Amino acid sequence: MANCEGTERGDGDEDANRAGGWFLVEAIVEQTTGYQESSDEDENSEDRGEDLVDFIDTRSLGDGQEVPLDLFVQQNARDDAATVQALKRKYTCSPASSSCVSLVDSELSPRLDAISINRGHDRARRRLFDQDSGYGHTQVDIGAPESQVSGGTQHTKGGGGAVQEAEEERVGGDGEAQCSAQTQQTPERAADVLEIFKVSNLRVTLLHKFKELFGLAYGDLVRQFKSDKSICGDWVVCAFGVYHAVAEAVKTLIQPICLYAHIQIQTCQWGMVILMLVRYKCGKSRETVAHSMSTLLNIPEKQMLIEPPKIRSGPCALYWYRTAMGNGSEVYGETPEWIVRQTVVGHAMQETQFSLSTLVQWAYDNDITDESELAYDYAMLGNEDPNAAAFLASNCQAKYIKDAITMCKHYKRAEQARMSMTQWIAHRGRKVADSGDLREIVKYLRYQRVEFVTFMGALKLFLKGVPKKSCMVFYGPSDTGKSLFCMSLLKYLGGAVISYVNSGSHFWLSPLVDAKVGLLDDATYQCWQYIDTYLRTVLDGNAISIDRKHRNLTQLKCPPLMITTNINPLEDQAFKYLHSRIVLFKFMHKCPLKSNGDPVYTLNNENWKSFFQRSWARIEGPDEQEEEEDEDGSTSRPFRCVPGEIARPL
């Protein structure tokens, strides 16, 4: 075998000295013509071995050099996925937020999931209330964790900050998504207060949380006002999400604007919750209270429940009374009377039963004969008069009102029947506070060309009810003031009006039964025919029989009657039998008016009072007047229908 160039094969000892003969000696390569030697192959250059330092990696695996880079890549991937998921929240739900059933189906049978024609998208339902972890009632705030998972969406805290996203849909399935608030978690608060205020039905959420904190429903303490403009002096305010410093300061800040304040403070994961019963110095509406409390507590108006309290509820009053005695409440001012009345034993024992005679006496003293007016006016005394309060607490208010008006009418009818016309005029005059000027009446009579002496003589016989002289007729064209003159006199004397339009009824004359003076306004030709046929006795002033509804026929002396008409019955021979029964006065001139439409001559109760006081001697005589009323006023005892207190022996 030929020897290879550059290789020596030894034998014997020479082979032993040469590592057994298998080691190959370095080959010698000759350089070709034109070859340029590089700096790396320069044999003469000094080699220090620096280029071979990292030629072989001798480091052990697991030193953690690649771990930060790998984690950074994973973290960026998660952040990118979360950002994309947040942008897609208004559209079809992504697989990351799809239901658990869809994920399980796609993972167990991917081939079946791939060939499905229409994927059913389950509508995401937002929880109305988050599950409480049990740490919500502590006053110490706990820092937020680094990573939170809520509703299938992951909240991570990266190197650049914290990103929160929440995918919500309105309750009721309308398909509209609400924008989620992105807030930064802070270690000072255990949970974000604004999370609860993103729901669509905020009031239901607040009512539920109120019941959890205070142990009873908010509706048990309040009555609802539908209008925000309704005025009330007492208000129940429950504010959520109040800062701790503000909650402590409100006990002092609210004192200048209210007369009474009952404040309770509770804590939850949303922050401080304040329940207040406030009595303001003046009545306020819900809008005013909301604006005032929003400024005072530094919270939005939507975070408050504002309604008036139940002032007639015993359990409600007892709740405020018992909680005010505990150390968990701050109370300022005097306790409202509706709480004291329903809780304190002394006030409860002082409550008396309703007395009908007291109601009748009150209606008689105030000259009330209308049921609606009596019910309204007496109900307004519920906070002042104990009998009125017992009346409001009764279930027979309508019956009491009807009975009281009936008795009041009986008393007044009997009182009127016992008085003569002179006494009645004096009685009506005492009801008028001021005294006017009788010259207004005299000037008006002169303006209508009516002799004052003739009128006074006819009025004297008219008021006395002299037969054939107890009917005064005022004749003239329209707009001459006939009705104005007669109506003003009738109002002062407290008379009654009858209308010919009701002549078809048997009871159209029944108002004359309870009146001292009557008036038939604007009698037409047909009315005069009816009077000439059926009412000649009425014009005479003699006793007549009047039919009343649900009553027997009543026989009485007909009161004096005034008639206004545009027809002169004295000129018509068809009414010749009425000529001797009436006294006629002509008003031929139109009533003058001021620029504002008021009459130039004022005919009111004050002027009629002055008229009768100054001309009393011509009508009745001075002796009877002096007996009726002396210088110190009326000497008659006032009517009393309530039982007095009788002194009984011990």
Curated annotation (Swiss-Prot):
Q: Which reaction does it catalyse?
A: Couples ATP hydrolysis with the unwinding of duplex DNA by translocating in the 3'-5' direction; ATP + H2O = ADP + phosphate + H(+)
Principal location listed in the UniProt entry: host cell
Asked if the keyword Nucleotide-binding belongs to this entry, the reply reads: yes
| Chain positions recorded as ATP binding sites | G476, P477, S478, D479, T480, G481, K482, S483
Q: Where is this cross-link: Glycyl lysine isopeptide (Lys-Gly) (interchain with G-Cter in SUMO)?
A: K557
The UniProt entry annotates the motif Nuclear export signal at 108-117
Region of interest called DNA-binding region, as start-end residue ranges on this chain: 185-351
- Cite the GO molecular-function annotations of the record: ATP binding; ATP hydrolysis activity; DNA binding; DNA helicase activity
Q: Which GO terms describe its cellular component?
A: host cell nucleus
The EC code for this enzyme is 5.6.2.4
An individual GO BP term: DNA replication
Q: Where is this motif: Nuclear localization signal?
A: 88-90
Q: Where in the cell is it found?
A: Host nucleus
- Spans of biased composition, class Acidic residues? 622-633
Location of region: Disordered: 134-184, 620-650
PTM comment for this protein?
A: Phosphorylated.
Q: Which UniProt keywords apply?
A: ATP-binding, DNA replication, DNA-binding, Early protein, Helicase, Host nucleus, Hydrolase, Isomerase, Isopeptide bond, Nucleotide-binding, Phosphoprotein, Ubl conjugation
**Subunit comment for this entry?**
Can form hexamers. Interacts with E2 protein; this interaction increases E1 DNA binding specificity. Interacts with host DNA polymerase subunit POLA2. Interacts with host single stranded DNA-binding protein RPA1. Interacts with host TOP1; this interaction stimulates the enzymatic activity of TOP1.
Q: Which family does it belong to?
A: Belongs to the papillomaviridae E1 protein family.
Q: What is this protein called?
A: Replication protein E1
- Species the sequence originates in: Human papillomavirus 72
